[in-house]
Amino acid sequence: STDRGRTFTRYDGNPVLTSDRPDFRDPKVFYHDRTGRWIMVIAAGQAMEIHSSANLRSWRFESRFGEEYGAHGGAWECPDLFELPVEGEPGQTRWVMLCSLGVEDGSRVQYFVGDFDGRNFTPEDDPDEVKWMDFGRDHYATVTWSGAPDGRRIALGWMNNWAYANEVPSVTFRGSNTLPRELGLRRVGGELLLTSVPAREAEKLLGEPFAVPAFAVETEHN
């Protein structure tokens, strides 16, 4: 694309990267200023792989992360990797790795906090520690955007769960997008945790409050 993603011309040299690993999918690509290279983080079975490129066409494998960290169950997918400032600690930043996966109670998004040097992601968390991005059951496949006003990191997820996604009654769709969220990092009890609040632009959607008095739900309610 030469017009900031508004139109695309298919590249004749596709695919630019292949693998014999299972579930090799969901690439997230961003530019890493410190190394001057493009970084691709991509799901590969029960882990995430990191590749780098100078031109977006020729890719070099850099590292693999995840086999011995966090929760495992279904395939790891929908990776993301980004840098965030630490709230209340001027000049301090950390990198966050997002990972969506299916576990016993359905689909969830876990995250890891650490450092990234352009080749390796090094988590601060213990290998057996699991940090969930959301404790609700309907927030999955989260992706983030950079370039938002004021340097904010905006996240958007799929409001559904693979445990029942194919059985949710609907008309022409399965689930919907979540509200955009602004992400941050806050130290709580010495531990860095991911924070999220609705993006400030969502306030434009607010209207007058509407209250429904208490009532019993009967079988005829649909």
Where are the predicted features?
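Surface loop/turn signatures of beta-propeller and other carbohydrate-active proteins
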Residues: 5-31, 42, 60-83, 120-142, ...
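Loop/turn-rich, solvent-exposed surfaces of beta-rich toroidal or solenoidal domains
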Residues: 87-113
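Conserved Ser/Thr-centered positions that define the repeating blades of beta-propeller domains
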Residues: 1-2, 50-56
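Short glycine/acidic-enriched loop and turn motifs that connect beta-strands
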Residues: 46-47, 102-105, 162-163
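A short loop-to-beta-strand structural motif that recurs across blades of beta-propeller domains
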Residues: 47-49, 110
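Residue-level detector of Asp-centered blade-edge/turn motifs that repeat once per structural unit
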Residues: 31-36, 83-91, 148-151
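Hydrophobic beta-strand segments that make up the repeating blades of beta-propeller
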Residues: 38-42, 95-97, 155
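Beta-rich accessory regions
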Residues: 90, 110-222
